[in-house]
Every structure is written in structure tokens, then in C-alpha cells.
Amino acid sequence: IHTTADFEYADLIEFMNDAINSGKEALKNGCKIYCDTNMIVNGASKMVLSKFNCEAYCLVADSEVVKEAKEKGVTRSIVGMEKAAKDPNTKIFLIGNAPTALYQLKEMIERNEIEKPALVVGVPVGFVGAAESKETFKSLGIPYITINGRKGGSTVAVSILHGILYQMYQ
């Protein structure tokens, strides 16, 4: 609510499958956090993450990701997610922009291509696919935090991460 100045978020946010505790456990053990935008990476508190030996990263601008996405005719968000999700040290996923990243992660989990994440913050914003991607992810039974409907965004994803870190850092 503080990040958006929108009180409706109190009714839209949803926490599933012990998301907070699962996220805290992954952070305590030091993990990588994949972000679908560099804006999330830049917003995440590197100082606090370093206290837990955690690192936030994004691959959408990676030259190999750009090349592969072009060759396959898909978005960089899809290819970035494919690569990040296969890294066994990536336990948390913050998705604030690209519904395609959330769909890709869901498909990989359903096909048992990857270990189930410790936490997914799925809050892509927008009119095309955002609400649907967030809704379909709920069926997986994994620790998940979302904002129902079209609202969300990179700043919301960062604020959710910071909320969890704040609880741990007190």
C-alpha cells in the first residue's frame, strides 16, 4: 500500500502455501533471486541481501538470452526464465512485469523440469495476460504471493521482497 498509495491492494494481495516462511527460509540459507526486470534488481536492497548471502539478478539483457530469444522467436523474458529456473541456487522468483515469465515458470514446474521454488512473487502488471497469468499459477500449490487482477509491477515486487527482509532484519 505504501509503495502504490492505493488502499485497494489490501484486498488484492494473496499469500498462499506458507509463502512468507518459505521465502524467509530460502533467504536465511542464502539463495539467488531471479527478477524479470533490471528495475527489480536495482530496487532490491543489496546491503540487506548481502547480509544473508543472497543475490538478485536478471537475464533479460544478457547477450546470450537476447540471441537465443531472437533465434527462437520468443520474448527475452521466456528465455531468461528458462535459464534462471534451471539454476539450482535460484530459489525465489520476482515477476513484476512479464506475464510470459510467469507462464514459462509455471510450465517448467508442471513438466517437472525444475525443482519447485521456495517462493514466487507473481505480480505482473497490465491489461494483456497479467491477471490470467497470476490466476493460473495458483493451482501449483507452491509458496506464492500475488496481487489479484491487473495491478502489480516491479515496484510492488520489490516492496514485497523488502517486507519479508524487514521482518528478518529486525
Positions of PLM-derived features:
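Short, glycine/acidic-enriched capping/hinge loops at junctions between secondary-structure elements
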Residues: 11-12, 43-47, 157
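Generic secondary-structure signature for well-ordered alpha-helical cores
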Residues: 5-9, 25-32, 49-50, 86-89, ...
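Buried hydrophobic positions in well-ordered alpha/beta secondary-structure cores of metabolic enzymes
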Residues: 36, 120-122, 160
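C-terminal functional extensions of proteins
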Residues: 128-170
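A short, well-structured juxtamembrane/interface segment
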Residues: 11-26
